[in-house]
Amino acid sequence: METSFDFEKPIAEINNRIDDLKESSRVGNIDLLAQIEDLEKTRDELRQKIYGSLTAWQRIQIARHPKRPYSADYVKLIFKDFIELHGDRIFGDDQAILCGIAAFNDNPVVVIGHQKGRTLQENMDRNFGMAHPEGYRKAMRIMKLAGKFNRPIITFIDTSGAYPGIAAEERGQAEAIARNLRDMSNLKVPIISIVIGEGGSGGALGIGVSNKVLCLENAYYSVISPEGCAAILFRDGSKASEAAQAMKITAKDLLNLKVIDGIIKEPLGGAHYDPVATAANIKAVLNEYLCKYETMSCKEIADERYLKFRKMGIYEDVAEEKMNVKK
């Protein structure tokens, strides 16, 4: 059964009517082409209207669509000769994080991404894309290999957050993420991150300290989920749509706030409508940035990443003002 959200129901109803007319035309050998074309035109106009004015909450729903392409899907569509690498060499292999080496335009790269499952069993195996400490340690192990062999790193961010369970905390979840933030900051190879769905808090940032952070049009990047924010601020999780609007976590908001460096276009309705076209858009942007980094030194690459994060946010340097007053 096709998944559709409340705001998409008018489109789904027209699609059902089109299917009914096509079936009636086939069974009864009746020419209903004119009616079908009229309905298709109405549907296309409605799609333009609905998807052209999405709210923040509606975009978040699209980012969570069960048929939305995941990291493994983009790996197949964008890269060649992907070889997955497993394990953190300390505890185990976390399937919520996908890591490996691949070829991008015949050049070697390292690819890392959060990975959700399609079925219940796959989601159980991959913990719904919520990584344990061993997932972040595995990612860092592979990133250090990239640094050693001078290979660019591409990460796909798609998680509701790092796993908050007791076992994860006992094995050092906060330490693992903090170590990734520190060590990614010091890598001398270019890192490009793309938020392809959910960008949840430290779980996303654990593989997101990058030279360039890009966001698909309907993805989001946030310190907390809208439901969690609503539960804390409004004492009512059902006010998630209001929280989403106030949090400024959509791609457009993030670009305005200079948290991300660019927005990658999606097909009308979301990436799940045309994964191949979405992958082509991602590939074009990756090619543009990777070509740029070929001409930069290791120091320039590391300095760019450092300055990018130092410039984030709005702050006032009161220490300098106090020194001027004393003079």
From Swiss-Prot:
GO MF term list: acetyl-CoA carboxylase activity; ATP binding; carboxyl- or carbamoyltransferase activity
Keywords: ATP-binding, Cytoplasm, Fatty acid biosynthesis, Fatty acid metabolism, Lipid biosynthesis, Lipid metabolism, Nucleotide-binding, Transferase
Reactions accelerated catalytically: N(6)-carboxybiotinyl-L-lysyl-[protein] + acetyl-CoA = N(6)-biotinyl-L-lysyl-[protein] + malonyl-CoA
Subcellular localization, as worded in the UniProt entry: Cytoplasm
UniProt entry tagged with the keyword RNA-binding: no
Enzyme class (EC, first level): transferase
Pathway: Lipid metabolism; malonyl-CoA biosynthesis; malonyl-CoA from acetyl-CoA: step 1/1
Transmembrane segments: none
Annotated CoA carboxyltransferase C-terminal domain residues: 38-292
Record-listed E.C. numbers: 2.1.3.15
Domain of life: Bacteria
GO CC entries: acetyl-CoA carboxylase complex
One of the GO biological process terms: malonyl-CoA biosynthetic process
Record Pfam families: ACCA (PF03255)
This protein's record includes keyword Nucleotide-binding: yes
InterPro entries to which the protein is assigned, alphabetical: Acetyl_CoA_COase_a_su, ClpP/crotonase-like_dom_sf, COA_CT_C
HAMAP family the record matches: AcetylCoA_CT_alpha
Task performed by this protein: Component of the acetyl coenzyme A carboxylase (ACC) complex. First, biotin carboxylase catalyzes the carboxylation of biotin on its carrier protein (BCCP) and then the CO(2) group is transferred by the carboxyltransferase to acetyl-CoA to form malonyl-CoA.
Subunit-structure text: Acetyl-CoA carboxylase is a heterohexamer composed of biotin carboxyl carrier protein (AccB), biotin carboxylase (AccC) and two subunits each of ACCase subunit alpha (AccA) and ACCase subunit beta (AccD).
Family of this protein: Belongs to the AccA family.
Protein name listed in UniProt: Acetyl-coenzyme A carboxylase carboxyl transferase subunit alpha
Lineage, opening ranks: Bacteria, Pseudomonadati, Elusimicrobiota, Endomicrobiia, Endomicrobiales
Gene: accA
